Amino acid sequence: MYKLILVTLDGTACDRALIEHVKLLAKQAQSRLVLLHVADGWAARIYGADAVSPEITEDTAYLRRVQAEFNGAGIPAEIQLAYGSPPEEILKAAEALKCDLIAMAGHGHRLFGDIFHGSTITQVRHRTLIPLLLVRAKKE
C-alpha cells in the first residue's frame, strides 16, 4: 500500500516520535523511504543548493544518521536535502517522487509564525491529495 514514504524531518527532538512510527509502518508495508529535510536558513534561501554553511553541513550529517538508523533496521532509505520554504519543498518532493504517503511530526504551535504564515503541516495538508501521517511529538 505504501511503497514510497516521504518522511519530513526538521532535525529537532520532535523527529523521534515520527521515526519510531515510520519504522513500524515501513517494516509492515515493506516500504522504501525518502528522508527529507528542508534547509530554510538565510544561506539556503539565498543560495539554494550552492549554499555552504554550518547549518547545511549539520543537516546533511543528521539525515545520514537517520538514514543509517533505518538501513540498520532493514528499511531502505535515501536522503534528500531541499532548500527554501518547507511547505513548498515538501509538496514538490512528494509529487516529483510520486510518494504514497507523507509522514510529518507536529510540534504544536509557534504563535507568531503560525499567525503570519500558517504551520507547515497546515499548508501541506490543504494543498496535497497524497495521504498524510501526522505524528504528535511527545512533550519532554
Question: What is each stretch, according to the model?
Answer:
Residues 36, 78-82, 133:
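General small-molecule cofactor/ligand-binding pocket signal
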Residues 37-38, 105-107, 136-137:
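Short secondary-structure boundary segments
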Residues 105-126:
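Glycine-rich, Arg-bearing micro-motifs that act as flexible, cationic patches
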Residues 68-102, 139-140:
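Structural beta-alpha unit
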Residues 3-49:
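Small/aliphatic-rich secondary-structure junction motif
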Residues 1-17, 126-140:
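Intrinsically disordered or low-complexity boundary/linker segments at protein termini
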Residues 52-64:
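Short, surface-exposed alpha-helical segments at coil->helix boundaries
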